[in-house]
């Protein structure tokens, strides 16, 4: 099980480690945070495949928070990966940037994410639900919801691949009841972060690794 977690590089420095500075230098060099972390994770993955005690046909990779991005990249690049754990909410990344534009107290329109999420040219071709959908029919579990609109897109890919049962979707407990969740096709512009998260069914204080969902799922898919 390869785990990709936010700021895992130099994690001995804890949350004081400034990932944004590293991201800036990587961008200046023609790289990106996503490109660098995906490259490093690929080295680990290739090493694992060389170990006699690891089943190469049952490798599962797990992404938590920012780590879901290199998880998606590894899945696209390496067809040997058996299954995926997506421990974050699923969103359309371009849409998030377009709608989270409410000016702050200094009348600036802040960018919705840190520079760590900046991937030059990415938005011209890709959206996160599209990339995840390309992983079909390999098993995947989503543990922290998002809009059912985006889950329907992923589910359609798994259905088309003949393995609809290989995609498992969970929402935050706060939004587990369908009657409580928002189910919209389009978001209004001018949202602040709090309103955006509420609209896409995200409960930030409950953002943690959902082992209570992942462990039973792993037992099922690794039989």
Name each model-derived stretch:
Residues 1-8:
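Short, small-residue-biased leader/transition segments that mark boundaries at the very start
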Residues 160-223:
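C-terminal catalytic histidine-bearing segment of alpha/beta-hydrolase fold enzymes
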Residues 20-29, 36, 82-132, 137, ...:
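Mobile cap/lid helix-loop segments that gate and shape the active-site cleft of serine hydrolases
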Residues 68-79:
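Short glycine-enriched nucleophile-adjacent loop
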Residues 53-65:
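Alpha/beta-hydrolase fold nucleophile elbow
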Residues 12-52:
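Alpha/beta-hydrolase active-site loop
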Residues 137-144, 167-170:
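Catalytic His-Asp charge-relay segment
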Residues 143-152:
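Conserved alpha/beta-hydrolase "acid-adjacent" motif
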């Amino acid at each position: 099980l390869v785990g990709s977690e936010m700021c895992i590089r130099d994690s001995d420095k804890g949350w004081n480690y400034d990932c944004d500075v590293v991201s800036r230098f990587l961008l200046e060099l023609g790289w990106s945070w996503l490109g660098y972390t995906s490259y490093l994770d690929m080295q680990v993955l290739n090493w694992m495949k060389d170990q006699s005690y690891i089943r190469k046909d049952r490798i599962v990779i797990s992404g938590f928070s920012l780590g879901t991005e290199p998880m998606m990249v590894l899945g696209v690049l390496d067809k040997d990966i058996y299954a995926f754990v997506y421990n974050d909410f699923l969103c359309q990344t371009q849409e998030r940037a377009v709608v989270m534009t409410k000016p702050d107290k200094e009348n600036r329109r802040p960018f919705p994410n840190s520079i760590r999420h900046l991937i030059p040219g990415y938005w011209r071709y890709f959206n996160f639900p599209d990339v995840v959908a390309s992983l079909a029919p390999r098993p995947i579990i989503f543990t922290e919801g998002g809009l059912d609109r985006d889950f329907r897109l992923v589910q359609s890919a798994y259905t088309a691949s003949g393995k609809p049962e290989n995609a498992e979707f969970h929402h935050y407990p706060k939004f587990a009841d369908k009657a409580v969740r928002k189910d919209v096709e389009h978001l209004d512009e001018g949202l602040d972060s709090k309103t955006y998260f509420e609209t896409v069914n995200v409960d930030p204080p409950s953002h943690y690794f959902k082992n209570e969902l992942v462990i039973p799922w792993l037992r099922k898919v690794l039989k």
